[in-house]
Amino acid sequence: MDVLKRIPVREQDAKERATNFKEVCLGYNKEEAMEEASRCINCKNAQCVKGCPVAIQIPQFIEQVKNGNIEEAYRIISESSALPAVCGRVCPQESQCEGKCIRGFKGDPISIGKLERFVADWARENGIKPTPAAQKNGKKVAVIGSGPAGLTCAGDLAKMGYDVTIFEALHEAGGVLVYGIPEFRLPKSGVVAKEIENVKSLGVHIETNVVVGKSVTIDQLMDEEGFHAVFIGSGAGLPKFMGIPGENANCVFSANEYLTRSNLMKAFDPDSRTPIMHGKKVAVVGGGNVAMDAARTALRLGAEVHIVYRRSEEELPARVEEVHHAKEEGIIFDLLTNPIEILSDDKGWVTGMKCIRMELGEPDESGRRRPVEVPGSEFVMELDTVIMSLGTSPNPLISSTTKGLDTNKWKCIIADENNGKTTKEGVYAGGDAVTGAATVILAMGAGKAAAKGIDEYLSAK
């Protein structure tokens, strides 16, 4: 065994998976996981833990995997993470734990994410669940939103003895995990639903179809329903658009709507009653993980798909693995290209998109080189569908109906990043509702910090 090289992970063949919604990555078996775990040198000053937003004790759980003690490995992980099977699949490990791995300075870093996934999947298959709190403390906390921030906050509070109720606006719990991430990357019934069941097994209650700010307000939850504190983890579901001519044409979608139709409403299923446009030639504007998800979904629905991104490949914000998979599956990358107008016929249906070539100039405030238009380089792409994947912002419904809850100019809730405390007493917030669209694991980290903040607040009362 070459300790500098990772144990390869089995995947569906690219041609085969491009025509189905089954999970792409097949994961490790026990023997492969133990062999990969044996590459870990068990650093005393583990940088990988510092790179993890929820501070999983990575060397300890990997040591248990190496020794074949998978249940103990799961116990270690579940002390820090409420959603290990999710994180093992969708976290950007290359810029977090694996990016800090000492092995990676000379050779391949340890496949921490794949090992976490293996442990979580093994625990699920063997009926192992996290340990609930020994007793309740009599205090009630409301959690708004059942995405990664809300589930993490709720799970941690339940372990501390709080009576926690999650209020979810949609008809199904999971937030972005169910409506935003495709089945081929994150299976819903086999993975997400089981993770939610684990959170519920801690004593967490989930009420769906409750739109906080409309069905009930935060003030009513605290003053009339008897909740001692509230955590807002409602995410950022309001899509952004470019503001170019033609964006109101038929068959221009936000990635948020397009993926929700497919993921939550199962529009990819021929028996589903939820319609979705089966475009023949689709452009997805954007370069993040959501853009890759939308593009790979459209591909599976039979389209020729183009990613249109105004910067170069080096600046793509999507995970390296997602870009690699998209390329393998046949998605075309039109880089250094920016849309300037969406074209349509006399009935308002998309016929194409006028674009202009870009080149990279000086770095902007983000540190990435600023894209600059190349004069006279305009051209037209013939298309029948355009999907805009330009990020999302929080829906202002909650903040606009809650007195004393301040937001910034982007309508994000202002909260202390260390404990989630907002400008309204007893109300905490975290995840995309505070930061704008970000990653699952960062939302989980915020939920974890807020749970600690809420516990400190209520313990002092």
What are these regions (language model features)?
Residues 433-460:
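A conserved FAD-binding loop/helix module that cradles the flavin
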Residues 17-35, 56-89, 106-133, 262-263:
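Ferredoxin-type iron-sulfur electron-transfer modules in oxidoreductases and energy-metabolism complexes
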Residues 38-57, 82-105:
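Local cysteine-cluster metal-coordination motifs and their immediate loop/turn environment
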Residues 248-279, 363-437:
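FAD-site-proximal beta/loop scaffold in flavoenzymes
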Residues 119-135, 192-214, 239-301, 407-418, ...:
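Glycine-rich dinucleotide-binding loop and its adjacent helix/turn
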Residues 163-166, 170-201, 205-207, 295-341:
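Rossmann-like dinucleotide-binding cores of NAD(P)H-dependent redox enzymes
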Residues 72, 135-136, 140-144, 196-244, ...:
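Feature captures the FAD/FMN-dependent oxidoreductase FAD-binding
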Residues 140-165, 291-299:
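N-terminal Rossmann-like FAD-binding beta1-loop-alpha1 element of flavoenzymes
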